[in-house]
């Protein structure tokens, strides 16, 4: 017979919806930024923002590539951006659902490459630092990251493995994390595919 090489449709669905991905990570002790589930009203977002403090960011649950995201620094900006973000989400991804997160100012963007087999084994191949970006699009990738120490490297790698095992992941994938100025790091999303940036990891790992 024919076997598809890569993650199952269920694994891709779980990580493709960012609100579901956040919930899955919380259940598996992977740190995430303070955030919400799917929000429908301006008032829900404002209540969350006033609880955690501005700035916050609105994100499309089905989003990617820097689309369907709006940073809000006040209640007024939530009113201005909520409908725009939902409209962008529907136009770009066919799904108007959005959620809110605490926005980290100028974080480092660290991603960890993982590989899983069909027997439940998962390994990570270290991290790439893709903090140099323009309009949320990566311009330069570096491995290993110059911004993290060995302890953080081990913790991020272990979290990426936990994330992959939580969804019975098969094949190559990437867990993306944000690193703040205090050295705290948070899961952002998982790309359920091999990325073009894998060549950077290949040069380091030969895999």
Walk through the language-model features, giving the residues of each.
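N-terminal beta-alpha lobe that positions the nucleotide/phosphoryl donor
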Residues: 1-175, 179-204
């Amino acid at each position: 017979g024919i076997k598809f090489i890569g993650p199952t449709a269920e694994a891709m669905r779980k990580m493709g919806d960012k609100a579901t991905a956040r919930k899955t990570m919380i259940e598996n002790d992977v740190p995430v930024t303070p955030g919400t589930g799917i929000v429908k009203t301006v008032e829900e977002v404002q209540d969350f923002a006033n609880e955690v403090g501005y700035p916050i960011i609105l994100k499309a649950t089905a989003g990617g590539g820097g689309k369907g995201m709006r940073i809000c620094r006040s209640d007024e900006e939530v009113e201005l951006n909520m409908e725009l973000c939902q409209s962008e989400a529907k136009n770009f991804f066919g799904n108007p659902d959005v959620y809110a997160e605490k926005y980290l100012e100028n974080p480092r963007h660290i991603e960890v490459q993982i590989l899983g087999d069909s027997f439940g084994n998962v390994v990570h191949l270290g991290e790439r630092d893709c903090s140099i970006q323009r309009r949320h699009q990566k311009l330069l990738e570096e491995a290993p990251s110059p911004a993290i120490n060995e302890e953080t490297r081990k913790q991020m790698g272990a979290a990426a493995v936990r994330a992959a095992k939580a969804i019975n992941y098969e094949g190559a994938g990437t867990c993306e994390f944000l690193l703040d100025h205090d050295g705290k790091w948070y899961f952002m999303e998982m790309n359920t595919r091999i990325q073009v940036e894998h060549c950077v990891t290949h040069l380091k790992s030969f895999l």
